[in-house]
Amino acid sequence: MKRYFVTGTDTDCGKTFVTNQLVNYFSSSAAIKPIASGCEYSENQLVNSDALLHQQQNHLPLEVVNPWRFRLPVSPHLSARADGASIDVHKVADYCLNLQLNDIKKLFIEGAGGLMVPLNEQDTWLDFLKLTRIPVILVVGMKLGCINHTLLTQEVFEINKIKCQGWIANCLDQDMLMLDENISTLEAKLKYPLLARTNYGGKISDICLSSL
């Protein structure tokens, strides 16, 4: 089973939407969101709306899709602390590396927040990637400032020798000035391919998804 870690240039860049689109595009694929904050109680259990989308799409138990759940809608390390818990990045890494799902050929692992979001007092998603070496798919929320955010993310990948499989342009605002020019700028400056594009909540448009 191939595994990909889906991260983004920012919070609310559209990771969950794009991840769901990838699962729709690829047969025999599934998605999980191992850590989620901002959960609410429903039927006597904590539920995160993003993880619930994956669970409903995959028809997997919520405990498989989202084993680490916390209440407050803040950074995972703060939300866990507020719940009297802590996140062990090694346990998260082991879970994501060892999870086996019948008939699934591609597993998309959605992170919470961006690459440098703290999971505990020492570790971030970057440390998770150093442990697992799972290749990354970068979701770029196309908005003002995205070029800077994306190039900074690329710098972190390169310094830490993290493999990025490619990036997806998630077009959030149909009124964004010079949208196509922004995408072209990123294509010229990034060292990994543009895999796909999504337009304002529409279906994913394949550009280079066959490389996954």
UniProtKB/Swiss-Prot annotation:
Chain sites annotated for binding substrate: S37
Binding positions (ATP): D12, C13, G14, K15, T16, F17, D50, E110, G111, A112, G113, N170, C171
Source domain of life: Bacteria
Presence of keyword Magnesium: yes
Pfam families: AAA_26
Subunit structure: Homodimer.
Gene: bioD
PANTHER family: DETHIOBIOTIN SYNTHETASE
Cofactor(s) required, per the database record: Mg(2+)
Organism: Legionella pneumophila (strain Lens)
Pathway connected to this protein: Cofactor biosynthesis; biotin biosynthesis; biotin from 7,8-diaminononanoate: step 1/2
Enzyme Commission (EC) number: 6.3.3.3
Record function comment: Catalyzes a mechanistically unusual reaction, the ATP-dependent insertion of CO2 between the N7 and N8 nitrogen atoms of 7,8-diaminopelargonic acid (DAPA, also called 7,8-diammoniononanoate) to form a ureido ring.
HAMAP family with a match to the protein in the record: BioD (MF_00336)
Compartmental location: Cytoplasm
GO molecular-function terms, A-Z: ATP binding; dethiobiotin synthase activity; magnesium ion binding
UniProt record similarity statement: Belongs to the dethiobiotin synthetase family.
Gene Ontology CC annotations of this record: cytosol
Keyword presence, Heme: no
Residues bound to Mg(2+): T16, D50, E110
Catalytic residues in the record: K33
Catalytic reaction(s) noted: (7R,8S)-7,8-diammoniononanoate + CO2 + ATP = (4R,5S)-dethiobiotin + ADP + phosphate + 3 H(+)
Descriptive protein name: ATP-dependent dethiobiotin synthetase BioD
Biological processes annotated in GO: biotin biosynthetic process
NCBIfam families xrefs: bioD
InterPro entries named in the record: DTB_synth_BioD, P-loop_NTPase
Keywords: ATP-binding, Biotin biosynthesis, Cytoplasm, Ligase, Magnesium, Metal-binding, Nucleotide-binding
